Amino acid sequence: QFSDCSKDEYQRYLT
């Protein structure tokens, strides 16, 4: 599971 920091970058990746 992604941590908050990694999750935020993952959201940018989806954008």
Curated annotation (Swiss-Prot):
Question: What are the EC numbers?
Answer: 3.4.24.-
Primary location class:
secreted
Q: Which GO terms describe its molecular function?
A: metal ion binding; metalloendopeptidase activity; toxin activity
Domain of life, per lineage: Eukaryota
Q: Name one GO biological process term.
A: venom-mediated disruption of extracellular matrix in another organism
Q: How is it modified after translation?
A: Glycosylated.
Please summarize the record's notes on activators and inhibitors of this protein: Inhibited by the chelating agents EDTA, and 1,10-phenanthroline.
Intracellular or extracellular location(s): Secreted
On tissue specificity, the annotation reads:
Expressed by the venom gland.
Is the keyword Hydrolase assigned to this protein? yes
Per UniProt, which keywords does this protein have? Calcium, Disulfide bond, Glycoprotein, Hydrolase, Magnesium, Metal-binding, Metalloprotease, Myotoxin, Protease, Secreted, Toxin, Zinc
Q: What cofactor does this protein call for? A: Zn(2+)
Report the cofactor remark. Binds 1 zinc ion per subunit.
Summarize the subunit comment.
Monomer.
What's this protein's function? Snake venom metalloproteinase that disrupts the muscle fibers interaction with extracellular matrix proteins. In vitro, is able to proteolyse extracellular matrix proteins surrounding muscle fibers such as laminin and fibronectin, but does not show any direct cytolytic activity towards the myogenic cell line C2C12 in culture. In vivo, induces a massive degeneration of myofibers, but has no hemorrhagic activity.
> Which family does the entry's similarity section mention?
Belongs to the venom metalloproteinase (M12B) family. P-I subfamily.
Q: What is the name of the protein in this document?
A: Snake venom metalloproteinase Mlp4.2
What species is this protein from?
Macrovipera lebetina transmediterranea
